[in-house]
UniProtKB/Swiss-Prot annotation:
Glycans are attached at residue 208. Its EC number is 3.4.22.-. GO terms for biological process: proteolysis. It comes from Leishmania pifanoi. The cysteine proteinases have a potential role in host-parasite interaction and virulence. This is Cysteine proteinase 1. The keyword Hydrolase applies.
């Protein structure tokens, strides 16, 4: 990946906002950050996260990245009145390039999403008019997990969707194995990226729809390695197929309401410094990260999606982020997929098993 000067990041952000949104925004170059103020915040950051660096060169590099991120957070806050960005989170000493390399997969998505098409059919029943849904409250969402230094967001997104569909259809909630996909799925590329529908396709082709429990095949790729597949474990859930949902937020909301959580891809470039609130103006160029929609609230101002991430519970709102509904924030509607699960409580849905 080509190196960019992190000191230009905030200015580039400003220019891109103006180009994309025209006169609706007033360009603001973030003010310089005083070294004394930055040093005080940096000291608190290191203490909070137990950070220690070897040598003056590395220390200086981390401080400069942190200082630049203070400017970036300032700018993002000026553009998002309902959200808060700051440098208290664990990623604040990374340059944007380092963050992207460690936690995002832009190259994989660019190579493999060209032929992604939505399925025509989703649900024949009329919308119910439900204004808010949170599948966490319905017992269909497992605790927030952590992918670590492995580019396995796709596996966490796919498995989170299957966990949610399994529980929403009437089965008991069970934490399922991301490691099964990271190590064994030979359609995707482990820590180097993957796609959620490809993962579901592999489950159908190679496992007859069966997914192991996390307890029987725990996650071990947090350090960035891909252990060999041992392809054995206790089956915790079974899918009957998968669907690529319409690229339409209302249709996605219908699926979330009636069926359960949905796996989606987003541009998470600016999530590095997200702390809380509803993101209403997300910088987005291309998809690079897989996450899980677990609910929405149309009554809120602004209305928002509830999105589960896989960077641990110390990130964002205890591992979650809220994105404003209706304006394709972070390109959330561009790649929605869901597994299907057989249940006596839901009608038959056409599936893709390829």
């Amino acid at each position: 990946m080509a190196r960019r000067n992190p000191l230009l990041f905030a200015i580039v952000v400003t220019i891109l906002f103006v180009v994309c949104y025209g006169s609706a925004l007033i360009a603001q170059t973030p003010p310089p950050v005083d070294n004394f103020v930055a040093s005080a915040h940096y000291g608190s950051f290191k203490k909070r996260h137990g950070k220690a660096f070897g040598g003056d060169a590395e220390e200086g590099h981390r401080f400069n990245a942190f200082k630049q991120n203070m400017q970036t957070a300032y700018f993002l806050n000026t553009q998002n009145p309902h959200a808060h960005y700051d440098v208290s989170g664990k990623f604040a000493d990374l340059t944007p390039q380092e963050f992207a390399k460690l936690y995002l997969n832009p190259d994989y998505y660019a190579r493999h999403l060209k032929d992604h098409k939505e399925d025509v059919h989703v649900d024949d029943s009329a919308p119910s008019g439900v204004m808010s849904v949170d599948w966490r409250d319905k017992g269909a969402v497992t605790p927030v997990k952590n992918q670590g230094l492995c580019g396995s967001c796709w596996a966490f997104s796919a498995i989170g969707n299957i966990e949610g569909q399994w529980a929403a259809s009437g089965h008991s909630l069970v934490s399922l194995s991301e490691q099964m996909l990271v190590s064994c799925d030979n359609i995707d590329e482990g820590c180097n990226g993957g796609l959620m529908d490809q993962a579901m396709n592999w489950i159908m082709q190679s496992h007859n729809g069966s997914v192991f429990t996390e307890a029987s095949y725990p996650y071990t790729s947090g350090g960035g390695t891909r252990p060999p597949c041992h392809d054995e474990g206790e089956v915790g859930a079974k899918i009957t197929g998968f669907l690529s949902l319409p690229h339409d937020e209302e249709r996605i909301a219908e699926w979330v309401e009636k069926r359960g959580p949905v796996a989606v891809a987003v541009d998470a470039t600016t999530w590095q410094l997200y702390f809380g609130g509803v993101v209403s103006l997300c910088l987005a160029w291309s998809l690079n990260h897989g996450v899980l929609i677990v609910g929405f609230n149309k009554n809120a101002k602004p209305p928002y999606w509830i999105v589960k991430n896989s960077w641990g519970s110390s990130w964002g709102e205890k591992g979650y982020i809220r994105l404003a509904m209706g304006s394709n924030q972070c390109m959330l509607k561009n790649y929605p997929v869901s597994a299907t699960v057989e249940s006596p409580h839901t009608p038959h849905v056409p599936t893709t098993t390829a």
